[in-house]
């Protein structure tokens, strides 16, 4: 009887759900994101809000922190009379994100990160002459700066996570706005 009791207790110790090991050092993931910039983008001609799309490679370090390297396309609009003049930025990013909160089951993670950004800004796709004969004085230029990001990951499977983020970008060197607030959603695929 004692033998069966020990076996029963051993079996009970093995019952339960095993959680996946997430955010281990050297794990890598591919992130795809879509954001709104400076408000909510609509077709209204007085709306200067825009949107952005990005892709990044994230590599985890000790403690679940991560390095992020990626590229992003951001477009916003500058209202002028009855039209909106497009301003586009193509940027590369490199940054470090610190995990400051996660749940015990390692499903939800919160990060705060800082990134360096560099890229190119184009106003009206380089076309200086407007429909009414006015000339744009803003030029296409290289831009540089940084971003601060608050990021959330929610794992829906062992290798798939949903992302939500809010970030503030500041870029110098261009002839247009320096600061852009972005918020959006994304998805991450763990690749190793």
Q: How does the language model describe each region?
A:
Residues 40-43, 79-85, 132-138, 170-174:
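Extracellular loop and loop/strand-boundary signature of outer-membrane beta-barrel proteins
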